[in-house]
């Protein structure tokens, strides 16, 4: 995609442009600036009996847009606040908010920064099990893994990584599996502009476009800015 003759670097806060990425694990790419700290976290987890397994990493705008539109069309499952499948609302605004329960607006998911990853403990994953990234997994098979991470995050002992989607912050449901390298993501988000995101949406075939554009200011207060930490 090309928007408004902007430079590639100016589009990076939205998942457009050409970030410097490195493959870290099994086809998952991350921002090159986090690789050293991510390797340290990987080694720390290994020393304590865990195996860091990535389930998602860099996700460009186009991929986020595809996920959003497929959820809007009913091609991907919509989950309620408890992580259970729900019926697709017919009202456009209700549909938008249903998607936002677990999915960020395209260009505002943080995954496009290359600093955020979804993680589980590979050692605790049963053979053949397809990870769903749900709250039940965090409190079930991966509970020990997340408890260890919680302690490291609380002590600022996770090499710059921490959780972003936590209880009491914004209106996206907590995602225990989603961690971010905060020093790098803060730097990359400095160039973010809601007006630019609005112009990108105006030029994009995004589901629920009318209501997104009409509500974008309030959506940003609830679903974007709280996660700029």
Task: Tell me the role of every PLM-derived stretch.
Residues 2-229:
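Cell-envelope/glycan interface and biosynthesis
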């Amino acid at each position: 995609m090309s928007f408004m003759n902007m430079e590639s670097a100016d589009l990076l806060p939205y998942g457009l442009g050409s970030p410097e990425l490195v493959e870290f694990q099994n086809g998952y790419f991350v921002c090159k600036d986090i690789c050293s700290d991510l390797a340290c976290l990987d080694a720390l987890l290994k020393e304590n009996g865990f195996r860091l397994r990535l389930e998602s990493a860099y996700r460009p705008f186009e991929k986020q847009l595809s996920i959003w539109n497929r959820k809007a069309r009913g091609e991907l499952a919509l989950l309620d606040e408890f992580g259970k499948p729900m019926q697709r609302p017919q009202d456009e605004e209700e549909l938008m908010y249903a998607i936002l329960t677990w999915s960020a607006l395209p260009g505002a998911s943080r995954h496009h920064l290359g600093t955020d990853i979804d993680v589980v403990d590979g050692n605790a994953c049963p053979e053949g099990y397809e990870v769903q990234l749900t709250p039940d997994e965090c409190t079930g098979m991966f509970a020990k893994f997340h408890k260890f991470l919680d302690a490291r995050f609380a002590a600022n002992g996770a090499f710059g990584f921490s959780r972003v989607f936590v209880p009491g912050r914004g209106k996206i449901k907590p995602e225990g599996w989603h961690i971010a390298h905060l020093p790098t993501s803060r730097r990359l988000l400095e160039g973010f502009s809601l007006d630019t995101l609005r112009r990108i949406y105006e030029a994009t075939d995004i589901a629920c476009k009318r209501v997104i554009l009409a509500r974008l200011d309030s959506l940003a207060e609830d679903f974007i800015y709280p996660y700029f930490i």
